[in-house]
Regions:
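Helix-loop element at the rim of GNAT/NAT acetyltransferase active sites that forms part
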Residues: 24-37
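Conserved GNAT acetyl-CoA-binding A-motif
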Residues: 115-127
Length: 156
């Protein structure tokens, strides 16, 4: 376990298929999805956008991962957004014992560089409202709120 605020020596690299089990374990524990992650989910992220899938590791242990995907909004949406190419952050997870050590920021920096190489000029993401720390981090990185996703149960 890392001490809070103390730097952790990590390296960020592209995901490799032999990372699957460690990434799956991390996704099951820490990713904010409505359904439990499966090997098929992680495999699909990799097969659809391998250039946008990164892991952070220290001593051969994966401490976090991020995967993104190029989006294809209609031309009208691109015009409204004043954008040429859009991508989304599909998921980001960091082991809870290693949070607040810059790992998420390092992962996102690698992802943003990969996006820039593909001439992507706008990045979107969804964050559950309960993920307050994530919202703060994204705000510090320059993300701005654009919409809110709401729901109401009709069965009660």
């Amino acid at each position: 376990m890392a001490q809070r605020g103390k730097a952790v020596k990590t390296s960020v690299r592209k995901f490799k298929i032999n990372d699957l089990d460690q990434v799956l374990g991390m996704a099951e524990k820490y990713a904010s999805w409505d359904a439990t992650a499966t090997k098929a989910d992680i495999g699909e992220f990799y097969s659809s956008s391998p250039e946008f899938f990164f892991v952070a590791e220290a001593d051969k242990k994966i401490l976090g991962f991020v995967c993104g995907r190029e989006s294809n909004p209609p031309a009208e949406t691109l015009n409204k957004w004043k954008s040429r190419k859009v991508a989304s952050i599909e998921t980001l997870a960091v082991d809870k014992d290693y949070r607040r050590h810059g790992i998420a920021t390092s992962l996102l920096s690698a992802l943003f560089e990969a996006f820039k190489q593909k001439k992507i000029d706008l990045v979107t993401l969804s964050v559950p409202v309960v993920e307050i720390a994530a919202m703060k981090m994204y705000g510090k990185l320059g993300f701005e709120p654009r919409a809110q996703f709401l729901w109401k149960r009709l069965d009660s």
